Amino acid sequence: METLLSFDEIKKIIPHRYPFLLIDRITELEEGKRCTGIKQVSGNEPFFQGHFPEYAVMPGVLIVEALAQVGAVAMLKLEENQGKLAMFTGIDKCRFKSQVTPGDTLTLSVEMTRVKGPIGKGTATAKVGDKLACSCEISFAIIEK
């Protein structure tokens, strides 16, 4: 997969930093409409120290956060939203279908389904290969810093 936005370019768009920046690169982007990002899940992730020490599994809430970050990139790349913040305002219909473990490549896709002014909603999926790990609907608001 081609890299459209590198890790350093992502950091220019969203404010998240280690250990909470959960996307490594963007591979597809249609500003304001859809975005796909990649997270290479390493055994060195700080959350694996406690979740779970004997059986490392990426917490579902962090998969959802990674999806929200991909959605934020899609919306904040729009010229009128540059320099603003994307706030995660809700989650609906969330389902976790399979575990994400060290060594996995997590493909995170978000497609906006409704955007009205600074508020919107999108459908999101996280996959490891062809296997669905998580699906949900995420809501957001774009605000001034």
Swiss-Prot record:
Catalysed reactions, as listed in the record: a (3R)-hydroxyacyl-[ACP] = a (2E)-enoyl-[ACP] + H2O
- Give any GO molecular function from the UniProt entry: (3R)-hydroxyacyl-[acyl-carrier-protein] dehydratase activity
Subcellular localization(s) per the UniProt record = Cytoplasm
Q: Which Pfam families does this chain map to?
A: FabA
Alphabetically ordered keywords of this record: Cytoplasm, Lipid A biosynthesis, Lipid biosynthesis, Lipid metabolism, Lyase
Primary role: Involved in unsaturated fatty acids biosynthesis. Catalyzes the dehydration of short chain beta-hydroxyacyl-ACPs and long chain saturated and unsaturated beta-hydroxyacyl-ACPs.
Please state what the protein is called.
3-hydroxyacyl-[acyl-carrier-protein] dehydratase FabZ
Q: Which organism is it from?
A: Macrococcus caseolyticus (strain JCSC5402)
